[in-house]
UniProtKB/Swiss-Prot annotation:
One of its GO terms (molecular function) is structural constituent of ribosome. Gene3D superfamilies: Ribosomal protein S11. It comes from Bacillus anthracis. Pfam families: Ribosomal_S11. SUPFAM superfamilies: Translational machinery components. The keyword Ribosomal protein applies. The keyword Metal-binding does not apply. This is Small ribosomal subunit protein uS11. It comes from the Bacteria. One of its GO terms (cellular component) is ribonucleoprotein complex. Keywords: Ribonucleoprotein, Ribosomal protein, RNA-binding, rRNA-binding. Belongs to the universal ribosomal protein uS11 family. GO terms for biological process: translation.
């Protein structure tokens, strides 16, 4: 029986000018996803995916690196302008936005979509260190 040659599909270059950057910044990690205007993902990155572990994962520097990697990958698809939606209370919020601008993407709007409870679940107890 003949062996199949292992051919990888080449990634299709989409030609998308405008998109949305979804930044999810928690106390433990920062995830950056760049999508087109319909919400189809072009690229994503996170502090954990870049090899940051433990307490270094939640730093602004890790968020900056995640945003840079996602931006470079999305710019290969022709992305130029962005709307930014930020969710969560983490340390990497501003750093990720600044990194997207520094990568050469034009930020047109910044929207905070952090979910705020109308007195829903009881929050976790206070830490005593």
């Amino acid at each position: 029986m003949a062996r199949k040659t292992n051919t990888r599909k080449k990634r299709v270059k989409k030609n998308i000018e405008a998109g949305v950057a979804h930044i999810r910044s928690t106390f433990n990690n920062t995830i950056v996803t760049l999508t087109d205007t319909h919400g189809n993902a072009l690229s994503w990155s996170s502090a954990g995916a870049l090899g940051f572990r433990g307490s270094r994962k939640s730093t602004p520097f890790a968020a900056q690196m995640a945003a840079e990697t996602a931006a470079k990958a999305a710019m290969e698809h022709g992305l130029k302008t962005l709307e930014v939606t930020v969710k969560g209370p983490g340390a990497g919020r501003e750093a990720a936005i600044r990194a997207l601008q520094a990568a050469g993407l034009e930020v047109t709007a910044i929207r905070d979509v952090t979910p705020v409870p109308h007195n829903g679940c009881r929050p976790p107890k206070r830490r005593r260190v």
